[in-house]
Amino acid sequence: MDASGVDRRYGVIEIGPGIGVLTRELAKRAAKVVSIEVDERLPPLLAETMAGVDNFKLVLQDVLKVDLKALIAQEFPGMPVAVCANLPYYITSPIVMKLLGDRLPIESLTVMVQKEAADRLAAAPGTRASSAISCAVSYYATSKMMFTAAPGSFYPAPKVTSAVVRMEIRPTPAVQVEDCLLYTSPSPRDISGS
């Protein structure tokens, strides 16, 4: 929670609230929380956890299909905005790239992901852990691994170690390029792993 840097000035977009344990804590700190959840089974549990919380709204939709610029303009006028997310490994890159590549008016993106994905998100260009996603993240933001969480920190315990990465969005990209999609897209070598 502290890793997000959120306080009462902030509007927060939360991706993947689950049953709302983190959501409730975010709502205590932020001016408003809008959570985006794709799993249609979770709203009843989330409603129970968030009962009595008036600065919370749920959007039941796939985050990759949400018009986030419109959502931010409608829900957070005049507020700084932070994104907090607990992302499954298989969808980490598409979501991070949507959030960064769409140049949304957000100040930061704080994600909990599988440790291996966190290593790549936070890797400095040219290091052993760097990859196409590392390059893209460093183009749009500065990133820092905040902490790791052992499987026993959760119930039920996953089979992997997780980590939190905070990305602070750059006001302008790190370098000027004519085609940022070409610059931030993986090369054939990155895709094949050779």
Annotate each PLM feature.
Residues 183-194:
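Single conserved hydrophobic/aromatic residue that forms the stacking wall/gate
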